[in-house]
C-alpha cells in the first residue's frame, strides 16, 4: 500500500520490506539446496538400469565431466566426457562432477543485473527499496524526487558504487557466452529424455527437462548484455537493410524478454532446482516416473 508523506510529498510503500525478504529467503533456499545437491555426487541419473541411448540427467550435473562408477544413480561410463573420476580430484566434496560445471552458470546468474539489484537489497539493504529511507549506519545511493528536485538521502557514509572487489561483476558479459552454451547442452539432455534404452517415449521428467532449457533461454536471451550486444552501438536501425530487417527484429525479441527478465530469472531458477529434485527422487526410488515405456 502506498502512503503519501505530507512533509516530503513522497509516495512510500509501507510494505517495502516484503520483496527483499522474499528474495532473501528464495536465494538462500536455492543456494542451500544446490550446494547440498552438488555435494552428493550420486542419484543424478535415471534410466531404469538400461544402458542404451536415453535417460534422465539432472541439469546440476550436465555435462558429466567425470563419473565415479562406484556410486549409485550415475550414468553409464559412455556419458562421461573424460572417463572415470581421477585421483587428482579426490579432494572435491563428494567427488561430485557438479563442482566442475556449476561455476559457469552460477557466475552468469550471480553477476546478472537483476540479481545484483535483488541481493544488494535483500542481503545488504543497500538500497533497501525504491523511495525508502536508508537503514541507519548503512551507505546509500537512494535518491528521491521531491517537487522536481533530486534529494539524496544522507546516511552519513559514502556510497562508492560497484568499485574495488565489486569490479568482478564485469565478468557478466563474458559469462554470458558460457550460459548460452549451456542452453544447447541442456537442450540435448531434453532430447535424451525422450528415449530410454533407444526407445522413443515420453515421461513426466521428459516434459520437465524440456521446459528447463526453454525457461533458461528466455532468461538468458533477455539478459541486458545480450540486448546491448544485439542493439547497442547503433544510432540508427533503419540506416541499412541488415540493421532494419535483422538487428531491429532481434532487438525487439530480446527487449520483449528483457522486460520480463525478473520473471524468467525466478522461473528458470526454481525450475532447474525442481528438475534436479525430480530426477533425484526417481533415481532413489522414492517416486515412480509416469512414462510411456511402462518402467
Residue locations for each model-derived region?
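Membrane-helix and juxtamembrane interface regions of eukaryotic multi-pass membrane proteins
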Residues: 1-204, 252, 260
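Alpha-helical transmembrane segments of multi-pass membrane proteins
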Residues: 25-30, 173-176, 212, 216, ...
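Transmembrane alpha-helical segments that form the membrane-embedded catalytic/substrate-channel core
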Residues: 110-119, 213-229
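Residue-level signal for helical boundary/lining positions with a hydrophobic bias
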Residues: 168-169, 208, 257, 272
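Hydrophobic alpha-helical transmembrane segments and immediately flanking/interface helices
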Residues: 183-211, 272-295
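C-terminal transmembrane module of eukaryotic multi-pass membrane proteins
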Residues: 217-295
